[in-house]
Amino acid sequence: MVDTSGVKIHPAVDNGIKPAQPGFAGGTLHCKCSTNPVRVAVRAQTAHNHVCGCTKCWKPEGAIFSQVAVVGRDALEVLEGAEKLEIVNAEAPIQRHRCRDCGVHMYGRIENRDHPFYGLDFVHTELSDEDGWSAPEFAAFVSSIIESGVDPSRMEAIRARLRELGLEPYDALSPPLMDAIATHIAKRSGALAA
């Protein structure tokens, strides 16, 4: 059996996963600035919440994974601090909008209408003071944490800890999300009826 003591994933899951609250309808995200923070309203429950090991997602200090979920873009509104937001990489499929002062990614948006996830915005629910958001369901792009400097010898224990938390580790997205991407592509190519 692999020793997982001391393995930290992300502060929002390290001490167990909080369940979603039935009927939860969203809340407000805020950056880490002590004065004039960026505030973003999310007026719906999130979906497909997961921890992500990719090197593009924002992670809190000391975390080896981010925690990210999606919500319909029509449910997201920047309330305050829009002038402080900048796009991290305009060429990336997910245009991550971060606070230029503290560096926190407030939301990610896909502008390409042909992208399988167009219409969904990516958010970090730990930036909210409200409880009740959808619970993380899986771990994505797990091997990518090596690219950010995690020693490969730690991977067995990290995957074991993810499983202890109920977060099945994948080196892509979860099977239902990968199926959604493949279905979108097959319909666009004509391999499946649209």
From Swiss-Prot:
InterPro entries, from UniProt? CENP-V/GFA (IPR006913), Formald_GSH (IPR014185), Mss4-like_sf (IPR011057)
Q: Which reaction does it catalyse?
A: S-(hydroxymethyl)glutathione = glutathione + formaldehyde
Keyword Heme (UniProt): no
Its EC number(s):
4.4.1.22
Cofactor stoichiometry and binding?
A: Binds 2 Zn(2+) ions per subunit.
Q: What class of enzyme is it?
A: lyase
List of residues binding Zn(2+) 2: C52, C54, C57
Q: Which cofactor does it need?
A: Zn(2+)
Which cysteines pair up through disulfides? They are none
Task: Enumerate the SUPFAM superfamilies for this protein.
Answer: Mss4-like
The pathway noted for it is: One-carbon metabolism; formaldehyde degradation; formate from formaldehyde (glutathione route): step 1/3
Gene Ontology molecular function: S-(hydroxymethyl)glutathione synthase activity; zinc ion binding
Q: What does this protein do?
A: Catalyzes the condensation of formaldehyde and glutathione to S-hydroxymethylglutathione.
Quaternary structure, per UniProt, is: Homodimer.
Descriptive protein name: Glutathione-dependent formaldehyde-activating enzyme
The species this protein was found in: Paracoccus denitrificans
